């Protein structure tokens, strides 16, 4: 049976695509690690930076915020982190869709 015809051809094409995805995922991990994604809160008083693979890489707090209560600072930190995390997750998802051509991966096989 020639390649591309019937179940065997479909299986071979699927295996080829899986191999391409595996090869691309290592490159994608490096690309994501190099990204810097910033979340902000309080009009820029607090900034949290994550890599594209969601590793925290920095926190900036405007000195004027330090006169506020502990609870205000904590709330703004959490809000900025959530903003960065959401942006990072969206970036990761978009890049995975590029890599997989929109093919849905089973749970646990994505990032």
From Swiss-Prot:
Domain of life: Bacteria
Primary location class: cytoplasm
Residues that span the membrane, as ranges: none
GO CC, one annotated term: cytosol
Record's keyword annotation contains Ubl conjugation: no
Keywords assigned: Cytoplasm, DNA-binding
Places the protein is found: Cytoplasm, Nucleoid
GO molecular function: DNA binding
NCBIfam families registered for this protein in UniProt: DNA_YbaB_EbfC
Subunit architecture: Homodimer.
Family: Belongs to the YbaB/EbfC family.
Chain's role: Binds to DNA and alters its conformation. May be involved in regulation of gene expression, nucleoid organization and DNA protection.
Protein's recorded name: Nucleoid-associated protein glr3498
Organism field: Gloeobacter violaceus (strain ATCC 29082 / PCC 7421)
């Amino acid at each position: 049976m020639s390649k591309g015809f019937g179940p065997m051809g479909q299986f071979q094409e699927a295996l080829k695509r899986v191999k391409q995805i595996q090869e691309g995922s290592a490159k994608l991990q490096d690309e994501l690690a190099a990204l810097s994604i910033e979340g902000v809160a309080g009009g820029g008083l607090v900034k949290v930076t994550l890599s594209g693979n969601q590793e925290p890489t920095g926190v900036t707090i405007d000195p004027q915020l330090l006169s506020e209560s502990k609870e205000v600072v904590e709330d703004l930190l959490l809000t900025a982190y959530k903003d960065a995390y959401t942006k990072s997750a969206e970036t990761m998802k978009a890049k995975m869709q590029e890599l997989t051509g929109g093919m849905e991966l089973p749970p646990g096989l994505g990032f």
